[in-house]
Regions:
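Residues lining hydrophobic/aromatic ligand-binding pockets adjacent to catalytic sites
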Residues: 1-115
């Protein structure tokens, strides 16, 4: 199972496989017609409240990841669908966050690998 995370601002590559935008909000500066993606999946993104708490630094990344995983547990079927895709082809999770080490796509990728 190959699941990778990639900033939405980086160019699409042949080996990206199935590309899923996993941000609730459309990325700034990207035209919808210009982005190469297979689906925009808002169902598996962090809630607005959780996203705002993390971005305003009211909670640290570990607390964010813990709460996000609790939210993801409510989206088990959607997670299984994406994990099944990843079993047959590469799955690329697209995100806009600047931090490439501490963001929701990393947490999501880990969760999907466990399904």
């Amino acid at each position: 199972m190959l699941i990778q995370c990639k900033r939405v601002y980086f160019p699409a590559e042949k080996d990206d496989g199935y590309r899923v935008l996993v941000d609730r909000l459309w990325p700034r500066g990207i035209k919808k017609a210009a982005l190469i993606y297979d689906e925009w999946n808002k169902a598996i993104t962090p809630s607005t409240e959780l996203r705002k708490a993390f971005h305003s630094e009211l909670i640290d990344f570990n607390h964010f990841a813990q709460q996000y995983r609790a939210e993801l547990a409510q989206q088990h079927q959607e997670g299984k669908r994406l994990a099944d895709i990843a079993r047959h082809q590469p799955l690329t999770l697209l995100y806009a966050a600047k931090d490439t080490r501490q963001n929701h796509a990393i947490v999501l990728a880990e969760w999907l690998r466990e399904l």
